[in-house]
């Protein structure tokens, strides 16, 4: 079935338990989104299995959690056994995020306990927690499969497969099938994703019962306030445009920059440091505790510029090439900055490196324009005739940028969305090139490697040795910043300032707009000083 035209409803109209309504109110959730309006009644009233496709940020997590909680509470009232819910997600970060949402929604239902099996706890600790029979268990397929033998799988009544397409692309298909064979055939299944393909249809046949409701909510139906642009430029000009955009503050609000390789994220960060532009990096090499803390600080506004490595691109390449190291692929299985993570109030997304597919693009730009807020996405595209001319700035995946762009445009048009070309006034930008070249030369390959090692060592120290200290002294945690300058490349102080001659006339203050505290040339004071000139300062002259 497709999404029907629905009138605005409130959560009260679903007949939810008062405790859940109180949890929603505490989370400041007043109005259900379109996907929630569609999914919740189907799950509660008709009891069918559901496959749902909706854009990121549309509220899919709450859409499957609420009906599960409501059915559990109804079973409690009817004095029936509460069946266990398994929530399968692709990454550890997403496990943590889903667990937090569960805690908030069930804060008035203390008997509904949840467990995240991807926590950094020992196997014995996880096993002991499973013996307490939590109502909701969250984890990645491999972790859930590991502990499934210790659980009473016959009690599992609900199965959620979140970010289904990503689970398949990460090679979890066999784990999912093995897990499904251990679960009852009568389980209530939810398959959720921002993009569903033919492989997802196979999952429907594998996991769902005979009665399945398919829900699809397009970006146009969600009325997303997303503006999308692309700029065709050379590989070196990417750095020039990024410098101009961030140094002149042409971009306002929180920004996420996506690159395709870990070395690229450190090169870009060191490059921006040359101009005094602070940024933080997020990639799979960092410890899980650091990654979660970086996302938390970003959401709190501690820093506004985040450079993310899109590991999904690496996995796509690795699946095509048997020579790729399996260690890198397995590490990236547990991480993806483009999927599921709830980056809050992101105003701008910059695809510094274009993704390898239109599907990956959808997930990237989905970080902004969430929850009915406005957002902008800009993508740098390297023309085929410009690729490979700069050995240092060269990126292998950029060779296919123009082909990928055509697929992205076609995909967006099918969603009734538009991506427009954008052109910078290169005559004005050209004046900044010599400073960009100086900064680019200062960031060497050795400097990038040293920055990468230094960052990992620092984050490991923060994650392991200081974890207990921060628990006892939470105020000290405020001093921990992830966007501090790395200083592995020599930073020239003058590069942090933008000379007036580069700004041109537009960069200078307009005397018709600028209002000083004192008027020019002290004209008022001169008026009186002229009258007093030549007079006796000791002589008092009475006014007429």
UniProtKB/Swiss-Prot annotation:
Region listing for Disordered, in residue ranges: 525-544
GO CC annotation: nucleolus
TM regions (residue ranges): none
Which positions does the motif DEAD box occupy? Answer: 162-165
Q: Name one GO biological process term.
A: maturation of LSU-rRNA from tricistronic rRNA transcript (SSU-rRNA, 5.8S rRNA, LSU-rRNA)
As for subcellular location, the record says: Nucleus, Nucleolus
Compositional bias, Basic and acidic residues, is annotated for 534-544
Q: Which SUPFAM superfamilies match?
A: P-loop containing nucleoside triphosphate hydrolases (SSF52540)
Q: Does the keyword Hydrolase apply?
A: yes
Q: What does this protein do?
A: ATP-binding RNA helicase involved in the biogenesis of 60S ribosomal subunits and is required for the normal formation of 25S and 5.8S rRNAs.
Q: Which family does it belong to?
A: Belongs to the DEAD box helicase family. DDX56/DBP9 subfamily.
What protein is this chain from? ATP-dependent RNA helicase DBP9
Species, as recorded: Yarrowia lipolytica (strain CLIB 122 / E 150)
Its taxonomic path starts at:
Eukaryota, Fungi, Dikarya, Ascomycota, Saccharomycotina
């Amino acid at each position: 079935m497709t999404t029907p035209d629905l009138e605005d409803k409130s959560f009260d109209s679903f007949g939810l338990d008062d405790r859940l309504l109180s949890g929603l109110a505490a989370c400041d959730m007043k109005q259900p989104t379109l996907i929630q309006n569609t999914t919740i009644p189907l799950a509660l009233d008709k009891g069918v299995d559901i496959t749902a496709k909706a854009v990121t940020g549309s509220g899919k997590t709450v859409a499957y959690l609420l009906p599960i909680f409501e059915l559990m509470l109804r079973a409690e009232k009817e004095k029936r056994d509460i069946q266990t819910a398994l929530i399968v997600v692709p990454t550890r970060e997403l496990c943590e995020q889903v667990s937090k949402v569960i805690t908030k929604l069930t804060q008035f239902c203390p008997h509904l306990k949840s467990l995240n099996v991807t926590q950094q706890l020992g196997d014995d600790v996880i096993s002991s927690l499973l013996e307490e029979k939590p109502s909701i268990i969250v984890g990645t397929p491999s972790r859930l499969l590991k502990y499934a033998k210790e659980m009473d799988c016959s009690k599992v009544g609900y199965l959620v497969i979140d970010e289904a397409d990503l689970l398949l692309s990460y090679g979890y298909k066999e784990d999912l099938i093995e897990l499904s064979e251990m679960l009852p055939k009568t389980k209530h299944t939810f398959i959720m994703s921002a993009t569903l393909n033919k492989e997802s249809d196979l999952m429907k046949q594998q996991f769902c019962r005979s009665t399945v409701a398919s829900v699809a909510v397009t970006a146009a139906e969600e009325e997303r306030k997303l503006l999308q642009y692309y700029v065709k430029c050379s590989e070196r000009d990417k750095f020039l445009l990024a410098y101009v955009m961030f140094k002149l503050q042409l971009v306002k609000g929180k920004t996420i920059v996506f690159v395709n390789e870990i070395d690229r994220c450190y090169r870009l960060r060191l490059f921006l440091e040359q101009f005094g532009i602070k940024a933080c990096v997020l990639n799979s090499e960092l410890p899980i505790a650091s990654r979660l803390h970086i996302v938390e600080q970003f959401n709190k506004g501690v820093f506004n510029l985040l450079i993310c490595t899109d590991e999904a691109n690496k996995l796509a390449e690795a699946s095509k090439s048997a020579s790729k190291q399996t260690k890198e692929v397995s590490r990236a299985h547990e991480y993806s900055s483009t999927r599921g993570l709830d980056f809050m109030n992101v105003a701008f997304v910059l695809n510094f490196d274009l993704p390898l597919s239109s599907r990956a693009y959808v997930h990237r730009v989905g970080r902004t324009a969430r929850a009915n807020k406005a957002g902008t996405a800009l993508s740098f595209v390297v023309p085929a005739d410009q690729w490979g001319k700069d050995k240092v700035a060269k990126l292998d995946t950029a060779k296919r940028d123009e082909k990928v762009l055509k697929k992205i445009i076609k995909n967006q048009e099918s969603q009734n969305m538009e991506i427009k070309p954008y052109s910078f006034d290169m005559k004005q930008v050209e004046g900044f090139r010599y400073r960009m070249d100086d900064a680019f030369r200062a960031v060497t390959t050795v400097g990038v490697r040293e920055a990468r090692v230094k960052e990992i060592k620092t984050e490991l120290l923060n994650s392991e040795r200081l974890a207990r200290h921060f628990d006892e002294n939470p105020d000290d945690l405020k001093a921990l910043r992830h966007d501090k300058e790395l200083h592995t490349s020599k930073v020239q102080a003058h590069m942090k300032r933008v000379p007036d001659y580069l700004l041109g006339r537009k960069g200078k203050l307009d005397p018709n707009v600028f209002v000083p505290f004192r008027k020019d040339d002290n004209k008022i004071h001169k008026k009186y000083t002229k009258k007093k000139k030549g007079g006796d300062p000791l002589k008092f002259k009475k006014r007429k």
